[in-house]
Amino acid sequence: MSQFDEKNKHIDVMGIRKILPHRYPFALLDKIVDWSIEDRTIVAHKNVTINEDFFNGHFPEFPVMPGVLIVEAMAQATAILGELMAETLFAHVVAKAGGGRRTFMLAGIDKVRVKRPVVPGDVLVIESRMVKQKNIICTAESVAKVDGQIVCSAELMAAYKDY
């Protein structure tokens, strides 16, 4: 991911599309506002609007973002961090890939806690930090916040795989 410069910490939605294979309706992040290879951290934003398809059924009279989609947004932020770190963290895997397309795929979810509802108008701020890496598997601690309060936390595992 050498096309992204660590001096410019912002990545817009078009940059995200260059990193992740996700597309509508599963492209859940709007922008990256900060990231660091050295600190192994990333901060991403998701603007939650009433126009989200999932609000049609979850729940029409009290629209709440499903917890599993909050976790998916956290996983996407973590995958972007992994992609940005791939040339250093996974240099041995990248070297063997032979130019093939690889991405981080969710491999495990532990210690999930959903602490409060996320509703239309909220800005979901996702913070992830890589805490462990072994071969092609990495583990991250991730939290999602609204107005500075934690709404969800999880430990995520991802595998760097061909697709």
Curated annotation (Swiss-Prot):
One of its GO terms (molecular function) is (3R)-hydroxyacyl-[acyl-carrier-protein] dehydratase activity. The keyword Amino-acid biosynthesis does not apply. The active site is at residue 58. It holds the Pfam family FabA. It comes from the Bacteria. Its EC number is 4.2.1.59. It is found in: Cytoplasm. Its main location: cytoplasm. GO terms for cellular component: cytoplasm; membrane. Gene3D superfamilies: Hotdog Thioesterase. Keywords: Cytoplasm, Lipid A biosynthesis, Lipid biosynthesis, Lipid metabolism, Lyase. It is an enzyme of class 4 (lyase). Belongs to the thioester dehydratase family. FabZ subfamily. Involved in unsaturated fatty acids biosynthesis. Catalyzes the dehydration of short chain beta-hydroxyacyl-ACPs and long chain saturated and unsaturated beta-hydroxyacyl-ACPs. HAMAP family: FabZ (MF_00406). PANTHER family: 3-HYDROXYACYL-[ACYL-CARRIER-PROTEIN] DEHYDRATASE. This is 3-hydroxyacyl-[acyl-carrier-protein] dehydratase FabZ.
